[in-house]
Amino acid sequence: MSRKDGFLALLVVVVWGLNFVVIKVGLHHMPPLLLAGLRFLLVAFPAIFFVARPKVPLTLLLGYGLTISFGQFAFLFCAIKFGMPAGLASLVLQAQAFFTMALGAFVFSERLQRKQLAGIALAIIGVLVLIEASLNGQHIAMSGFMLTLAAAFSWACGNIFNKKIMQHSPRPAVMSLVVWSALIPILPFLLSSLLLEGADHITQSLITIDMTTILSLLYLAFVATILGYGIWGALLGRYETWRVAPLSLLVPVVGLASAAVLLGETLTGMQLAGAVLIMAGLYINVFGFRVRRTARVSG
């Protein structure tokens, strides 16, 4: 991975890590499914009038929108509704990286080398340490945990659809994909909000919306979605899934740090240890070969 693409990947990690703080702020005044629906509404409109429809099969576009957008966030919000702590959900959701690599090996016959497997194993240990730290003193409903894993699997399926889309076109328009795929989850989210959150709650939330919620929506739509998914999709189309997907493991690290700084939450020793293990695993997985090549040239 080039330095430029590495920087872009880390930018997405920071944006998505801060996303959890923004979501928490936005949910103070608006129910989750409505917030998610409005997020994608802002992504699609008015941009859809200025961005050409992507030249990809409709089935792939539908699959992408229903998995990475609606499926991921519908399962995630239901998990939190059924008792899954939001912080722990942000960690368990990172299982998408391993689902993506497994699906990549099955669908695209991508081969993982031993150095990558070692890095992934180290990162998995780090995630488990973070989860153990978050589970300490908390009661977790099994339904919430399983729904969070379903959200992670939906995200991974979306990554695979994205890879297929990128393979379909030699020069894919990433922003076109992001904008047009945002159309797909709008109706499912709004219908789900109407059924699960109620018309009265929706009306009250819209009538009393404040500037904090508006700014949260703008961040979720234009920064986390258009910028974040646009860059992420381009990287998945340019590199093997095993190089890109594990980078998302840094998202909960940024999430924990930003929550500590912006929300006053504290990091325990176990959380710090987990973060270090994840970063070490990512270094081995993503940069291991480049270090060896550089060493050979220098020698």
UniProtKB/Swiss-Prot annotation:
Cytoplasmic topological segments: 1-6, 53-59, 109-116, 161-175, 238-243, 290-299
Tell me the ranges covered by the EamA domain, including all copies.
14-132, 153-287
Q: Keyword Cytoplasm: yes or no?
A: no
A GO CC annotation given for this chain: plasma membrane
- What InterPro entries does the record tag this protein with? AA-Vitamin_Transporters (IPR050638), EamA_dom (IPR000620)
TM helices/strands, residue ranges: 7-27, 32-52, 60-80, 88-108, 117-137, 140-160, 176-196, 217-237, 244-264, 269-289
Top-level lineage group: Bacteria
List the ranges whose topology is Periplasmic: 28-31, 81-87, 138-139, 197-216, 265-268
Gene3D superfamilies, A to Z: 1.10.3730.20
Topology of this chain in the membrane: Multi-pass membrane protein
User: Which cell locations does it reside in?
Assistant: Cell inner membrane
Instruction: Name a single GO biological process.
Output: amino acid transport
State the protein's purpose.
May be an export pump for several amino acids and their metabolites, including cysteine.
Family the UniProt entry places it in: Belongs to the EamA transporter family.
Which named protein is this?
A: Probable amino-acid metabolite efflux pump
- Which organism's genome codes for this protein? Salmonella typhimurium (strain LT2 / SGSC1412 / ATCC 700720)
